[in-house]
């Protein structure tokens, strides 16, 4: 729909990327979408300032108009080495698989708590990307006014 209107599909993988959703390496894969642009960062450098933008050659060439851009996340050999090391650890330590296993366990246990705690609403998520809806006001005991 967005492409039919001349727009681009942009996936922000800053929080959902690098295996956090468990079943897939990228969050957009859960929606069966191939975005035109993907942004990523944070977990990419495991605390080291590193980010990236991935797109097609055609889209990238439209930005090749002489304007330069600089930021603190700009590429350098140290950051690139750290990013590669992070990818190696994700692979070697099977962190994507772990995100799925631990996430499935957490979601199951959190859903089990719903019957004991009325303030817990929906529990949803994939892998270690989990959301818990809470209704803290309905069952909250407020202090008595003086």
Predicted segment positions?
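Conserved N-terminal phosphate-binding loop of PLP-dependent enzymes in the Aspartate aminotransferase
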Residues: 1-140
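A short, hydrophobic C-terminal helix/tail in secreted or cell-surface proteins
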Residues: 141-146
